[in-house]
């Protein structure tokens, strides 16, 4: 199969970018505290950027004759980014740290994609 490793990494990105988008949404919805007014609109920017990347990656995968994941089940079954339940037991700083971890993972995955 042509570009098999590239397609694999791109599809992993599809699953993980989808998961990251949901984590950003969750952070956006469950945010509270003194930095709310600054951070809440920033989450909108993060969501837009992740959604844009997801679209570009999916279209690139299609251009390579690949099949991007396109169901919630496929995303959930294939993501490597851990999710949290939607509850109020996490603080905003904890949620932001979770975002940072997700972005670091994505950075490594993009680098891996460049190398294959």
Walk through the language-model features, giving the residues of each.
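Acidic/histidine-rich alpha-helical segments that form the ligand environment
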Residues: 59, 79-116
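Generic structural signal for well-ordered, non-transmembrane alpha-helical segments
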Residues: 11, 15-18, 44, 48-55, ...
């Amino acid at each position: 199969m042509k570009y098999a490793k590239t397609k694999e990494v791109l599809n992993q990105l599809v699953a993980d970018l989808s998961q990251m988008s949901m984590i950003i949404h969750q952070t956006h919805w469950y945010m509270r505290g003194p930095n709310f007014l600054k951070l809440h609109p920033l989450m909108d920017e993060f969501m837009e950027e992740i959604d844009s990347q997801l679209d570009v990656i999916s279209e690139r995968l299609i251009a390579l004759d690949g099949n991007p994941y396109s169901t919630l089940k496929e995303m959930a079954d294939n993501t490597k980014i851990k999710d949290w339940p939607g509850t109020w037991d996490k603080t905003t700083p904890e949620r932001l740290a979770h975002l940072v971890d997700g972005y670091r993972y994505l950075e490594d995955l993009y680098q891996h994609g460049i190398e294959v």
